[in-house]
Amino acid sequence: MKKLLIAALVMLILGLGGYLIYDQLGGNRPVELSLEAKSPDTLSGQTFRGTPVDKGLEQLFQKIQTTQKLHPGAKLHTIYYTEPAGKLDTLEVFAGINLPFGAPDLELKEFSEGRYILAKVTGNKWVMPSPETIKEKIQDYAKANKLTLSGYYIDKIVSETEVHVIAPVR
């Protein structure tokens, strides 16, 4: 009986400790949703079509990060048109930075939508909500506010602990 009580106490302490760590990393922070009355930033970047293990994907992100270093304040943005289910499935992704003008070898992506839903997500990457969870929250927000989404999502990497998900509204 005494061993059972000690085991239960140890489990309680471990569970409480785990929860406190999870909370400290930002696991309980809510996703902040708002409607922005402006177009998403114009992006300069490139579209990649291939598999996640393709060297071209890594090279694309290296190229964009190199361009980003030349433009302080520019943030990495990604748009996944086709998300892979596995390592060998095809994906189509646009990677770019918020530049209002083109750069050599980069395509300019401008958005015609005049509004978008902004989801601000903060916390450690290990405890952030999944992309599916964020998309569900955005869709629920759009439905509650009688908004029609354009059907794609722009991920803006603000920092290692903050991501903005932009969902243009028709």
For each predicted feature, which ranges?
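A solvent-exposed interaction/effector surface
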Residues: 2-170
